[in-house]
C-alpha cells in the first residue's frame, strides 16, 4: 500500500482515528444495565454478566462503551464483562501526564482489585492499540487480545519520517485543544463523521455521543497514538491475538488497497512480529465494523473465544 502525498496520509489518518459505518448500518441494541459501575484510577468501569471467564472491552478514540453495546448484549449471558471508559472520553474527566502509561497501569490494577484471571481484551481502534500494548507488557496475565481495526502503529505514521509524524501529531493535538465543545461537536457531525459513516441516521446517532468527549483530551490521546510504534515489542506479545480488519472497496481503494487482499497484506506487514496472531477480514464494512457487520464481528469474536479460552 503506497501513498503519493502527505495530504493522502492525513486523510487516511483521520479515517483510521474515528468511527465509520456503512449505508445500511443501524445503531446496535443497547447493552443491559450494568450490574456495577466503579472507578479504578483513571478508568471508569461498567460490569455486566457473571460468567466464569472475563472479557474487557476498551472503546476507541472519543468513544465510550456505547460503541460495544451490541457485543456486550451478545456476550453478557456467558461471560463477565468489564467495559472501560478512558479518561477524557464520554464525559470522563481528563487527566494530566502520560495517557497510555496511566491507563495501562490502571488496567493491571483492575485485574488485581477484581481478581480477574486471564481476561480477553477486546479493543477498537485506539483501544485495540492499547490491547497490543498490554500484550507486550504482561502477556502471561491475558487470555488473548482482539483488536478491531487497531494496530501497533498508527497507519498514517507508517508512511512518514519520525520528524513528520511528530509535527503532524503536535499540530493535531494543538488544533483539537483550540476547539470549544460546541466547535468539536459541529466538526464531528459536519466534517468528520459524514466522510466515515455513509448513513446519515448513523451520523445523527453517533455524533452527539462522540461530542461528549473532551476535545483537548482527544487531541492528546491522538497525539500519543500517532507517536507510538509498538512493532519492535511485538515478539513479546506471546498471547493469542485476533486482528479484525474491515474492508470497504469504495473507501480503501482510494488509499491504495484496491482489493481486500491488498489491505490484509498491508496489515499483516504491520503486525508480522506478533508470534500468535490471526487476521480476519470483514468485507463491506468500515472502521466501525461492529455497526456495519455486527453478526460477522460477533462471530469472529466467538470463534476466537472458543479457541483461546
Annotated model-derived regions:
Residues 41-93:
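Conserved HGGG/HGGXW glycine-rich cap/lid loop of the alpha/beta-hydrolase fold
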Residues 282-294:
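Catalytic histidine-centered segment of alpha/beta-hydrolase-like enzymes
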Residues 157-163, 177-236:
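Conserved alpha/beta-hydrolase catalytic His-Asp/Glu region
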Residues 2-55, 76-79, 117, 152, ...:
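Alpha/beta-hydrolase fold catalytic core
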Residues 117-159:
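Conserved hydrolase catalytic core segment
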Residues 29, 48, 82-122, 126:
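Active-site loop/oxyanion-hole signature of alpha/beta-hydrolase fold enzymes
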Residues 241-285:
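Conserved loop-alpha-helix segment in the C-terminal half of the alpha/beta-hydrolase fold
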Residues 145-179:
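Flexible "cap/lid" loop of the alpha/beta hydrolase fold
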Amino acid at each position: 500500500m503506497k501513498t503519493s502525498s502527505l495530504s493522502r496520509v492525513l486523510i487516511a489518518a483521520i479515517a483510521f482515528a474515528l468511527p465509520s459505518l456503512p449505508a445500511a448500518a443501524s445503531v446496535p441494541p443497547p447493552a443491559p444495565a450494568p450490574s456495577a459501575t466503579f472507578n479504578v484510577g483513571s478508568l471508569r468501569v461498567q460490569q455486566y454478566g457473571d460468567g466464569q471467564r472475563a472479557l474487557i472491552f476498551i472503546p476507541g478514540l472519543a468513544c465510550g462503551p456505547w460503541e460495544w453495546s451490541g457485543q456486550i448484549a451478545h456476550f453478557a449471558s456467558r461471560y463477565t464483562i468489564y467495559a472501560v471508559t478512558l479518561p477524557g472520553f464520554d464525559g470522563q474527566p481528563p487527566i494530566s501526564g502520560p495517557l497510555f502509561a496511566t491507563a495501562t497501569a490502571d488496567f493491571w490494577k483492575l485485574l488485581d482489585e477484581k481478581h480477574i484471571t486471564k481476561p480477553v481484551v477486546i479493543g477498537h481502534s485506539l483501544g485495540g492499540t492499547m490491547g497490543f500494548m498490554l500484550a507486550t507488557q504482561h502477556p502471561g496475565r491475558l487470555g488473548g487480545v482482539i483488536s478491531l481495526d487497531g494496530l501497533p502503529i498508527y497507519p498514517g505514521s507508517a508512511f512518514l519520517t519520525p520528524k513528520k509524524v511528530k509535527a503532524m501529531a503536535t499540530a493535531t493535538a494543538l488544533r483539537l485543544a483550540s476547539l470549544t465543545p460546541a466547535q468539536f461537536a459541529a466538526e464531528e457531525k459536519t466534517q468528520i463523521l459524514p466522510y466515515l459513516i455513509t448513513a446519515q441516521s448513523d451520523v445523527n446517532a453517533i455524533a452527539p455521543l462522540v461530542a461528549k468527549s473532551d476535545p483537548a483530551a482527544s487531541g492528546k490521546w491522538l497525539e500519543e497514538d500517532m507517536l507510538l510504534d509498538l512493532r519492535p515489542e511485538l515478539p513479546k506479545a506471546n498471547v493469542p491475538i485476533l486482528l479484525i480488519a474491515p474492508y470497504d472497496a469504495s473507501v480503501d481503494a482510494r488509499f491504495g488497497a484496491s482489493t481486500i487482499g491488498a489491505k490484509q497484506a498491508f496489515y499483516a506487514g504491520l503486525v508480522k512480529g506478533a508470534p500468535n496472531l490471526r487476521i480476519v477480514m470483514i468485507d463491506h464494512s468500515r472502521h466501525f465494523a461492529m455497526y456495519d457487520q455486527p453478526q460477522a464481528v460477533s462471530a469472529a469474536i466467538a470463534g476466537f473465544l472458543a479457541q483461546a479460552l
